[in-house]
UniProtKB/Swiss-Prot annotation:
It catalyses: L-glutamyl-tRNA(Gln) + L-glutamine + ATP + H2O = L-glutaminyl-tRNA(Gln) + L-glutamate + ADP + phosphate + H(+); L-aspartyl-tRNA(Asn) + L-glutamine + ATP + H2O = L-asparaginyl-tRNA(Asn) + L-glutamate + ADP + phosphate + 2 H(+). It is an enzyme of class 6 (ligase). InterPro entries: Asp/Glu-ADT_sf_sub_c, GatC. Allows the formation of correctly charged Asn-tRNA(Asn) or Gln-tRNA(Gln) through the transamidation of misacylated Asp-tRNA(Asn) or Glu-tRNA(Gln) in organisms which lack either or both of asparaginyl-tRNA or glutaminyl-tRNA synthetases. The reaction takes place in the presence of glutamine and ATP through an activated phospho-Asp-tRNA(Asn) or phospho-Glu-tRNA(Gln). Heterotrimer of A, B and C subunits. This is Aspartyl/glutamyl-tRNA(Asn/Gln) amidotransferase subunit C. Its EC number is 6.3.5.-. GO terms for biological process: glutaminyl-tRNAGln biosynthesis via transamidation; regulation of translational fidelity; translation.
């Protein structure tokens, strides 16, 4: 796939980018180079290759799931305007 000069100008217009003819020609070359690279990558046979999320087989170190703060629910709800059954009540906004 390659872009024509008119297509590059149209894309620039849609993106609200002012572009001169020289800039459009340069941009056309850059974009067509990118499309050629994509075509080369798509031509590679990847049959039998398992997809991967990362280039290296590493895993994230996880910290221990431990409580670090005490339960302050009662203190927070003591200053709330209205609560019911441990839940905060708020005024109805949408009818």
């Amino acid at each position: 796939m390659s872009l024509t000069l008119e297509q590059v100008k149209r894309i620039a217009h849609l993106a609200r980018i002012e572009i001169s003819d020289d800039e459009a020609l340069t941009t056309q070359g850059h974009l067509n180079g990118i499309f050629q690279l994509i075509e080369q990558m798509q031509a590679v046979d990847t049959t039998g290759i398992e997809p991967m999320a990362h280039a290296q087989d590493v895993s994230q170190r996880l910290r221990e799931d431990a409580v670090s703060e005490g339960d302050r629910r009662a203190a927070y709800q003591a200053v709330a305007p209205e609560i019911e059954a441990g839940l905060y009540l708020v005024p109805k906004v949408i009818e």
